[in-house]
């Protein structure tokens, strides 16, 4: 059950609803992120519906019984699709948002060069990994806080807000001091303590689909974040593991419209990790835009041959010029506008 509060509901109204539910033996979880606060209920829902006059409480707009196991992220209670804003940059149904940058932050020079390439390629958000969960314990694990500081310096230079991954619940507070958006990667999609921690952090969250996860499992993971009060969640389809060996992963392009039908959350696509090869990134980007994705997230590197992480899939300048052309020309055909990048800082060389 979900209680939708009126847009002008006061803090006192919300707290009163929570108290009523608690006194009845249930749990109430307040989420903010849309036009009105939403309160998700758990417990004896049938008894609550029969004995509690929830619709009569001050500030309550409506009460919705949901059949989906994911209550707060479901389209059952929020019919219109959500828009998530990352430092003012929108991700939602009317725009195409390009997120680009290096898979891993290596040096200040490499990160700044990649950010300038990303901006020239139509990106409005900068991705970059400071903490890297790798399949091999011997692979480059990221620069940690040093990498976060590099990203912050590059943001100041280029004006691009930061999207970066957090891999441990203990690091959420640290990463949140630098990041504009927190990313939960495929390997951590069901790391429930991490999901709860990012849900309480007060930052927008990008949730990548687990490499072997069903769409329902993906949405249930998003529910963990929403239940902690954060509905500013963007879902990212990044390819799933199948028997196919010709590509790094298999892009489940059908997951985009399915997830958009089931959930009000924005859905973007990662063509870089799906294909794992530079020559596949642009074709998969076209497919993502055509199917109605709300954005794409792309790996960029000024010198892919020396990259410490995922060089074979990173785009270079010529690819980015083509990507900018693709995004500019395809966006209007699917009823969208390309999200512009924020203005760079005064005096910067971006």
Q: Where are the model-predicted features located?
A:
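Active-site mouth loops of central-metabolism enzymes
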Residues: 8, 41, 96-113, 136-142, ...
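Hydrophobic faces of well-ordered beta-strands that scaffold small-molecule active sites
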Residues: 96-102, 124-128, 162-165, 180-184, ...
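Catalytic alpha/beta core domains of metabolic enzymes, predominantly
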Residues: 86, 199-300
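Non-catalytic terminal accessory/regulatory regions of metabolic enzymes
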Residues: 1-98, 344-350
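Alpha-helix-loop-beta-strand connector modules within alpha/beta enzyme cores
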Residues: 140-164, 197-204, 253-267, 313-336
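Glycine-rich, proline-tolerant flexible connector loops at the mouths of alpha/beta enzymes
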Residues: 127-145, 302-312
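Active-site-adjacent beta->alpha loops and helix N-cap segments on the catalytic face
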Residues: 75-80, 136-150, 169-171, 186-202, ...
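Catalytic beta/alpha-barrel core
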Residues: 6, 143, 159-168, 180-193, ...
């Amino acid at each position: 059950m979900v209680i939708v509060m009126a847009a002008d509901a006061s803090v006192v109204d919300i707290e009163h609803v929570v108290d009523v539910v608690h006194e009845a033996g249930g749990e109430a979880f307040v989420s903010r992120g849309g036009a009105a606060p939403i309160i998700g209920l758990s417990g004896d829902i049938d008894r609550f519906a029969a004995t509690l006059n929830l619709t009569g409480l001050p500030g309550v707009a409506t009460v919705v019984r949901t059949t989906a196991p994911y209550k707060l992220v479901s389209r059952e209670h929020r019919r219109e699709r959500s828009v998530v804003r990352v430092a003012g940059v929108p991700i939602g149904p009317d725009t195409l948002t390009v997120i680009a940058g290096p898979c891993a932050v290596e040096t200040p020079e490499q990160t700044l060069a990649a950010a300038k390439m990303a901006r020239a390629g139509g990106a409005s958000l900068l991705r970059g990994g400071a903490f890297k969960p790798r399949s091999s314990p011997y692979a480059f694990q990221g620069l940690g806080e040093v990498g976060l500081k590099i990203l912050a310096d590059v943001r100041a230079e280029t004006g691009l807000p930061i999207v970066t991954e957090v891999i441990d619940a203990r690091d959420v507070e640290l990463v949140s001091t630098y990041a504009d958006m927190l990313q939960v990667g495929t390997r951590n999609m069901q790391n429930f303590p991490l999901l709860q921690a990012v849900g309480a952090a007060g930052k927008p969250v990008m949730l990548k689909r687990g490499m072997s996860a069903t769409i329902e499992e993906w949405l249930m993971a998003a529910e963990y974040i929403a239940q902690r009060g954060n509905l500013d969640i963007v879902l990212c389809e990044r390819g799933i593991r199948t028997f196919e060996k010709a590509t790094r992963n298999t892009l489940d392009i059908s997951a985009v419209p399915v997830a958009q039908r089931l959930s009000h959350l924005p859905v973007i696509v990662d063509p870089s990790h799906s294909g794992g090869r530079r020559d596949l990134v642009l074709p998969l980007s076209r497919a993502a835009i055509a199917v109605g994705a709300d954005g794409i997230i792309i790996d960029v590197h000024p010198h892919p041959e020396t990259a410490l992480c995922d060089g074979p899939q990173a785009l270079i300048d010529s690819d980015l010029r083509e990507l900018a052309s693709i995004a500019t020309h395809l966006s209007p055909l699917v009823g969208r506008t390309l999200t512009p990048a924020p203005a760079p800082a005064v005096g910067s060389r971006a």
